[in-house]
Curated annotation (Swiss-Prot):
Location in or out of the cell: Virion; Host cytoplasm
Name of this protein: Transcriptional activator VP30
Biased composition (Basic and acidic residues): 30-41
Interaction with the nucleoprotein as annotated region, ranges: 202-237
Residues where Phosphoserine is found: S29
UniProt keyword Metal-binding, yes or no: yes
Amino acid sequence: MEASYERGRPRAARQHSRDGHDHHVRARSSSRENYRGEYRQSRSASQVRVPTVFHKKRVEPLTVPPAPKDICPTLKKGFLCDSSFCKKDHQLESLTDRELLLLIARKTCGSVEQQLNITAPKDSRLANPTADDFQQEEGPKITLLTLIKTAEHWARQDIRTIEDSKLRALLTLCAVMTRKFSKSQLSLLCETHLRREGLGQDQAEPVLEVYQRLHSDKGGSFEAALWQQWDRQSLIMFITAFLNIALQLPCESSAVVVSGLRTLVPQSDNEEASTNPGTCSWSDEGTP
């Protein structure tokens, strides 16, 4: 359509419009040069450029990335899924309007809640728990080794029917263990998480953001926001995946750092050496 319109116009007009376009591009590039010049001057004047990211004001309440969703394909096709083996996400909020309409149209009897096994809402008061919420006498001293043994134990459990206070404590365990990884390991943690859960690359951004924000969480505020804003099923999926992958990855990416720290371990305390986060990988520490 455009080509035939071009052909019908006089050559001069066509030429003029192209020239005009070129002129426009040149104008942009010259303004870019000016910008670069100004940037160089300001940089050389101060020699220090503070990253703008530190000037962002904290937004309250905290916004949490959406939980990674792996929606059941049967549900997406508009059929109710009644397989007891299906481990996919069966939440209706995850469906598009069209998929939801299909589902409603096909549904003839029975209660949706019953068939979709919708989990009970969690106790939101546990977002910022106190020590009293975890009724317990004085327990063992918490060392890194204790954390690893605890994570190994819970990685083997089915936590779908677990009580809320324990689930909340498991979220804290994940947060604490995330912070034992070096920052450079977080993208590997994210990739391994996606692979284990069979999630697409479109979920990489929210998963990575959760790990990054747990890693830099001050005072547990992001952890509390996660508990309040994610549903129980999403929390269970995330925690289960993390506990299973965290123990397989070395907690420090740099072999140089690890070998350097190894030289500092006192000879008499070799049995205790594994309480140092940098001495070896999670998996090494986990084996008796």
